[in-house]
């Protein structure tokens, strides 16, 4: 059961990384004189809410991770990749079958990069939850401390770390963190919430 969960988890991660790259590469109308937002002193020019969310969250969370010494360790990355390979083998799959050594190396690099990103994000979420508490929602790549994110962002906004000048974009940005109807919450005090940040999801067992 654990191996099947690991395979599903990593498959979603690969798709998510592809979608993430697509968002980064998407162009949006800009107005050099009127940025939609500023983040850590940098102007953000976009009319797309998803691009805005990424442009704000990425530097703020990078800064948070640096402040708290959050990173993926080599042993954790290796364990993640090993779980993935075990899961693929259990399903009778082999990503390297029929590939050249160069292609195999590229796949290994992709796995390591994916593992590093997912592990780091899980650790950031764990740290935010430990600091702010609140409710947790179910997400494809693991538990997400939604209330902690909102408090973190409200604090950073009050400190002047970011500002959204466009009222319409601001409303759509904050909706993700304030509209409960669009999320699936773990029961506060329930089993899922209790174990959410005790065991990394790629090592979870039923």
Where on the chain are the PLM-derived regions?
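Short, low-structural-confidence N-terminal segments
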Residues: 1-53, 58, 147-206
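Residues in flexible loops and secondary-structure boundaries
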Residues: 9, 47, 68, 80, ...
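Extracellular/secretory pathway and lumenal proteins
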Residues: 14, 21, 69, 132-133
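N-terminal targeting/tethering segments
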Residues: 21-115, 206
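Contiguous hydrophobic segments
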Residues: 71-84, 88-99, 129-143, 185-206
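A contiguous, mid-protein "functional segment" used to position or interact
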Residues: 113, 117-174
